[in-house]
C-alpha cells in the first residue's frame, strides 16, 4: 500500500481519480483576520481487495491550535449540466458523484480508499498570532500509527486586516429547513438557540444582509403548496380590524444585529414567477389561528390591497422606531416575465407609497423591466447578466 499526497487549492474539485490534472501548491498567504483553507489529497495505490482504509492524519505546526481538518465527502448529481447548453468548462457532464459536504475529523481518524483520491479540507483561523511564515506539516499513518506519507505547507500571515465588506451580501437561510433538520418547532427557545449558531456562521462567511420572514416566504414552492409557517409578524383580526404585533420581529432584529448583520431583506409580498398571488399569511380571528391569505388570494384583490396598506404603514413605523428603516430592502416578486409587466407595476405602486424605489429589489432576468424603469435595483441571474453589463448598469446585483 502506497499513499501519495498532494496539496491543492480550496477552489479545486477533487474527484476520485489520481488528481493528475490539478495544480499543486506548497504555500499561501492570508491577512491577520482572514480564514485560509487548502486541501490535502491522498491517493492510495494498493493491490489489496479492500475499498476502505481507516487511517490517521496529524497536524504539526505552531498554528495547530487554530487548524481544523474536515474530510471532503461526495453527493450524487443527477443533472450536472444541460446537454446542448454548456461550455467546455464543466468538470462533470454526466451523472456522478461530486465533492461537496465537509465532515469534521474526530481524533485524527480518516477514511482512505483503495486506488482512489480522497481530499481533506484544512482550515486555518489564527487568533492573535504574530505575522510571519509558518510551516504546517501534515502526516498520514495507518490506524496502527505506522507512517505512510507526509507533506508540508508554508503559510504567511500578513500584518494587515481585511476591511469591512463594501457590498451587500445576502443569502436565503430558511428557518423552516433548520427547524426540520434539527427536529424543533419554529419559535421555541431551542429553535432560537440553534438559529443564533447558524447566524454566526452565516456572518462569519461574509454575509451582512439576511432574508427576514415577515410572513412565510413564498419561495421555491409549487403552486398550491405551502412551506411550514415561519412568520415573524403576529396578525390579529379583532372585530374586523387588523392588529399587528412586532415582538418576534424585534427579537429577530436584535439577534441578527448581535450576530453582526447590518441589512435586512424583507420577505416577498407576492408569489414568485408572475406575482399572481399573496404569500401564506396566518392570523388569529376570534381565538382561531388560521390562514387568511395564500395561493387562493388574487394578488390585486381589494382585500389583500387593504391588508397591505394597513400592514406596511405599521411596519415602516416600527422599522423607523428601531432605526433600521434605511438598512432595509423590500421585494415585490422575483423573476417577473414580460407578460407580468402590468401586474408587477400595480403591485409595486402599493409598496412605493411606503418605501423608496431604491429599496425595492427583485430577482430579474428580463432586461426590459430595468430599461423601462420598472425595477430600479435588479438582482440579475448570473446567466442573464450580459445585456445589463453591456448597457453599463451601475450598482448591479447578481445571484446564482
Which role does the model predict for each range below?
Residues 2-19, 46-121:
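Surface-exposed binding patches on compact interaction domains or structured appendages
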Residues 94, 135-142, 149-354, 365-372:
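Aromatic-lined carbohydrate-binding surfaces of glycoside hydrolases
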Residues 391-400:
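Active-site clefts of carbohydrate-active enzymes
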Residues 357-385:
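Extracellular glycoside hydrolase catalytic/binding regions
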Residues 42-50, 107-166, 192:
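Extended acidic/polar, glycine-enriched regions
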